[in-house]
């Protein structure tokens, strides 16, 4: 399907229940509706984010008792992934509090984390903070 602004607007303006129905129909076409995927969320870098996203407990507006940590090591992430796998998870989602992920040694380390978890026959997804893209 080729995505156009018109097609996106058409979907966006549909009633919520119609969207839910269509999404469930497509989901059932490809997945057993009686099964769920178990995932584990791992905060690979906590605290220190300068953003103020209202939904995020790490946002500057919230004063929580979260102990911040710098970027986890690849081995720490692998340990979390193994624990998750042992408990039945098939996916690890890595989250990091960042303003903008740069193409630097931290990003290279995240790529290594992804590769390492994939080598354990697990799926990986990442939420790496707000990224600013300049075109």
Regions found by a protein language model. Name each.
Residues 60-96, 112:
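Conserved alpha-helical substructure of the radical SAM core
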Residues 36-40, 92, 124-126:
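Hydrophobic faces of well-ordered beta-strands that scaffold small-molecule active sites
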Residues 134-135:
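Conserved small/polar residues in nucleotide/adenosyl-binding loops
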Residues 104-127:
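Alpha-helix-loop-beta-strand connector modules within alpha/beta enzyme cores
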Residues 1-55:
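Flexible, acidic/Gly-rich N-terminal and inter-domain linker regions that tether
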Residues 48, 72-76, 105-109:
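Short secondary-structure boundary/capping elements
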Residues 41-43, 97-99, 127-131:
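Active-site beta-loop-alpha junctions enriched in small/polar residues
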């Amino acid at each position: 399907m080729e995505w156009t602004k018109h097609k996106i607007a058409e979907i966006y303006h549909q009633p919520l229940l119609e969207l839910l129905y269509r999404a469930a129909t497509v989901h059932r076409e490809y997945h057993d509706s009686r099964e769920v995927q178990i995932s584990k969320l791992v905060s690979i870098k906590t605290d220190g984010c300068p953003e103020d996203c209202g939904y995020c407990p790490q946002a500057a507006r919230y004063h929580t008792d979260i102990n911040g940590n710098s970027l986890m090591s690849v081995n720490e992430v692998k340990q979390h992934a193994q624990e998750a796998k042992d408990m039945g998870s098939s996916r690890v989602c890595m989250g990091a509090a960042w303003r903008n992920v740069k193409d630097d040694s931290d990003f290279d380390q995240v790529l290594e984390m992804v590769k390492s978890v994939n080598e354990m026959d697990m799926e990986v997804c990442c939420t790496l903070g707000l990224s600013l893209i300049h075109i």
